[in-house]
């Protein structure tokens, strides 16, 4: 029993010694990197005065740009009609999250970074840290929701267009904010290592409890990062496949268009022959109305030689047929038909001198009926194909631009937040890792910069947002 008790006491002493060493190491890191600098303002600073002034200016500009940019995004969606669509409510939610970061989190962080000590009390510290976790988590989860929305819209556009209702979007946004609250609230409920009493030199920092660090970093960053990586890769593959399918469809339609042009020539030749015969019969009906002495003369003038319908084209038909041709024909066929019209008009002018106006009226009433095509012309089909292809091209261009914008947003998100969350996850398990306050402040503000960069990304890569921003800022488009 005595040996057992001695063994237990030895283990307890070792544990206490280890904890004391860890605390001493942390305190040593804090003391070694905690110099104070006097200033002309009568307060001590964590950095030299010139550095404090420069830091304050830079960080204040970041805060102002974050506030202004995200307010412009919110106003653009609600005031500019092309942006007033359901899926843009995700962007509004993201802008609200970034705006709360700029208003509730960043100003206190500026003061804390420059002063090097927390002077606002323990309760403000707890609320500030909770808002920090919740708002940053909401910003990241909103990016994840936007990625999922784009993924469903591209991979299943028909079904998802019916499912993407305002209620569904608002439900997803609500889930994002509820999850953010769940991830950020445990420290307020006791899952923390905060001191009970704050001294002037007591740091206000995120809890380093290993369990909470793993829980919060996974929910706030690592799980959304995995989801966005997989989703964006699927979006890339789906967009690439659709572009490849469109290229194949374009080749097929080009070949089909060429075949239609060839068939159009044959059909035109056959229709001319039928029209010639029909017009010949009509001309015979016309010649019965005149006297027998003029019958042979009129028959010679009205009887077609090669293409008789060209000789029965009055001047009044010129404008009428020119209005029809651009609709029924493509660019190449307009030139050919234009030449035929010139020949027909010339022939009409020469024949109108030798025939009576009444005869022309009677012939003109019958000729258009005989030359009318009951089936749609191949040129009409080609125009329809071109219209559909153009609509598909515009749609795919928008999808590709949206996917590219999403990829840039995700890339900026990773660059901004990955350093912070790597350090945040490593520190609780590495007591001997001494990091300077300047480095910690840098990676923390690098993450905050993500809230300022999102509106800039929209402005650069989205034409509608650019127009809306210019309209809100009273700039000429």
Curated annotation (Swiss-Prot):
Keyword tRNA processing: no
Gene Ontology CC, one term: plasma membrane
TM spans (from-to): 56-78, 89-110, 128-148, 169-191, 217-238, 406-427, 440-460
Keyword Cell membrane attributed: yes
Biased composition (Basic residues): 296-312
Gene3D superfamilies: Rhodopsin 7-helix transmembrane proteins
Superkingdom of the organism of origin: Eukaryota
Spans within the Cytoplasmic topological domain: 79-88, 149-168, 239-405, 461-477
A Pfam short name: 7tm_1
Localization: Cell membrane
Record's bilayer topology term: Multi-pass membrane protein
Extracellular side: 1-55, 111-127, 192-216, 428-439
InterPro entries xref list: GPCR_Rhodpsn, GPCR_Rhodpsn_7TM, Octopmn_rcpt
Location of region: Disordered: 256-317, 334-358
Biased composition (Basic and acidic residues): 263-272, 279-295
Entry-listed glycosylation sites: 11, 16
Cystines in this chain: none
Single GO MF annotation: octopamine receptor activity
Summary of the function given for this chain in its UniProt record: Receptor for octopamine. Octopamine (OA) is a neurotransmitter, neurohormone, and neuromodulator in invertebrates. The activity of this receptor is mediated by G proteins which activate adenylyl cyclase.
Family affiliation: Belongs to the G-protein coupled receptor 1 family.
Protein name per Swiss-Prot or TrEMBL: Octopamine receptor
